[in-house]
Swiss-Prot record:
Pfam families: Ammonium_transp. The gene is AMT1-4. One of its GO terms (molecular function) is ammonium channel activity. Specifically expressed in pollen grains and tubes. It is a multi-pass membrane protein. Gene3D superfamilies: Ammonium transporter AmtB like domains. The chain crosses the membrane at residues 12-32, 55-75, 90-110, 136-156, 161-181, 207-227, 251-271, 292-314, 318-338, 344-364, 377-397, 430-450. The keyword Manganese does not apply. The lineage of its organism: Eukaryota, Viridiplantae, Streptophyta, Embryophyta, Tracheophyta. This is Ammonium transporter 1 member 4.
Length: 504
């Protein structure tokens, strides 16, 4: 907006002189324009400060999601593994911060670069730049550690701590940054912000990361859980699934609400700026990015709410009871799905997104049980499956006007197939699903396989039965009295004396 504020002394002189004393009029015009330029400069500074404050606040919201992940994970595992899963969430943030600082941000946004990987800003050298300031680094770091946090849930309760440390560093330092470069850097080969040679003339519109964050974390978790195998006792004779319930639905609900709160930084915050005008529109005197930010918060909310209610009634029909943890996962599945297209779809379309996301999650969970795939937090199904649906959804429902406002460029660029925009955007999004699946499978799948062969991945069976907390972390997360221990409240054997699974 500041660029529209300008002053021309030559235009002012005739107005000030009135045909006399042109020298004085010229001096007055120069003075007025000088003062005007000073005000315009301060206006530009204010806009910059507002945008950076908005981005910092969004980063703080997304970082708060780490607490949500920690609470969700803690409530979803058995009490004997609580300290372990909490520590992994802390390590995700700490190791991720160091490796994203050293390598990750450079690989993701180091410009000038090629279409595959960035090659500038290692260790934040030569930083900040006019295009990237410190708040942007902080914001992108919170996304990187979110992807790592997703993976930790898939391999919970049976993984050596050193494996967490290795995979978290590798994911945040290399695997995730390269994917984010492809789709979010202006140099990325599939970025919608490219100035030329857009993929299918549209690029990939993965606004806040259904693919970049959720699919990356979900597929990494898929490979980790596949290579490790299910937890002891998860499947009985003949492959019959045995429910290993988490120890605290209270923590699951707390974590879900913290994640919901943080998603208002995750999706609306991905605009990175808020002080930007789009111009006048019918029915309003002024219209800008602040309106798009608000719409994005609304679509995010509606998708999550619809998915939660769909899961509530869907699971009631399938299983015959109301389950709060299933509803929480359904809600998060709706959020993961809408993350791609939250900024470019109408609110009514978000209802479709959430409804389908709930059934995708329930279907993936049913398939996982049939294949004897064990993911304690349903992270691979939720983030991988619902994330993939969100990418497809955007290719179907993205609105032409919103794409033009946010990404600019050719006003006739492809948009959603069901909105009359042809199939090019959808084709680009199918490519995104394929390349993310391939890249993460090759990198993270190989890493987990190497850790498995080196016997650094899974803990010994006796430690798994006893619990990771007492065997690896110096004790349990909760204090128990002698009476509670004697009465079997702390540790009890599930399914009889011959059942190898010990519940807590």
């Amino acid at each position: 907006m500041a660029s529209a504020l300008s002053c021309s002394a030559s235009d002012l002189i005739p107005l000030l002189s009135g045909g006399a004393n042109a020298t004085a009029a010229a001096a007055a015009a120069e003075y007025i324009c000088g003062r005007f330029d000073t005000v315009a400069g301060k206006f530009t500074d204010a806009a910059y400060a507002i945008d950076n404050t908005y981005l910092l606040f969004s980063a703080y919201l997304v970082f708060a999601m780490q607490l949500g992940f920690a609470m969700l994970c803690a409530g979803s595992v058995r009490a004997k593994n609580t300290m372990n899963i909490m520590l992994t969430n802390v390590i995700d943030a700490a190791a991720g911060g160091l490796f994203y600082y050293l390598f990750g941000f450079a690989f993701a946004f180091g410009s000038p670069s090629n279409g595959f990987i960035g090659k500038h800003f290692f260790g934040m050298y030569d930083f900040p730049q006019p295009t990237f300031d410190y708040p942007y680094f902080l914001y992108q770091w919170t996304f990187a550690i979110a992807a790592a946090g997703i993976t930790s849930g898939s391999i919970a309760e049976r993984t050596q701590f050193v494996a967490y440390l290795i995979y978290s560093s590798f994911l945040t330092g290399l695997v995730y940054p390269i994917v984010s470069h492809w789709f979010w850097s202006s140099d990325g080969w599939a970025s919608p912000a490219r100035s030329e040679n857009l993929l299918f003339q549209s690029g990939v519109i993965d606004f806040a990361g259904s693919g970049v964050v959720h699919m990356v974390g979900g597929i990494a978790g898929l490979w980790g859980a596949l290579i490790e195998g299910p937890r002891i006792g998860r499947f009985g004779v003949g492959g019959k699934p045995v429910t290993l319930r988490g120890h605290s639905a209270t923590l699951v609900v707390l974590g879900t609400f913290l994640l919901w709160f943080g998603w208002y930084g995750f999706n609306p915050g991905s605009f990175a700026t808020i002080f930007k005008a789009y111009g006048e529109t019918p029915g309003s005197s002024f219209y800008g990015q602040w309106s798009a930010v608000g719409r994005t918060a609304v679509t995010t909310t509606l998708a999550g709410c619809t998915a939660a209610l769909t899961t509530l009634f869907g699971k009631r029909l399938i299983d015959g009871y109301w389950n709060v943890t299933d509803v929480c996962n359904g809600l998060l599945g709706g959020f993961a799905a809408i993350t791609s297209g939250c900024s470019v779809v109408e609110p009514w379309a978000a209802l479709v997104c959430g409804f389908v996301a709930a059934w995708v999650l329930m279907g993936c969970n049913r398939l996982a049980e049939k294949l004897q795939f064990d993911d304690p937090l349903e992270a691979a199904q939720l983030h991988g499956g619902c994330g993939a649906w969100g990418i497809i959804f955007t290719g179907l429902f993205a609105e032409k006007r919103y794409i033009a406002e946010i990404f600019g460029g050719d006003p006739n660029r492809p948009f959603g197939l069901l909105m009359g925009g042809g199939g090019r955007l959808l084709a680009a999004h199918v490519v995104q699903i394929l390349v993310i699946t391939g890249w993460v499978s090759v990198t993270m799948g190989t890493l987990f396989f190497i850790l498995h062969k080196l016997k650094l991945l899974r803990i010994p069976a006796e430690d798994e039965i006893a619990g990771v907390d007492p065997t690896s972390h110096g004790g349990l997360a909760y204090m128990y009295t002698e009476d509670e221990i004697r009465n079997g409240i702390m540790v009890r054997r599930v399914g009889g004396d011959n059942d190898p699974n010990v519940g807590v």
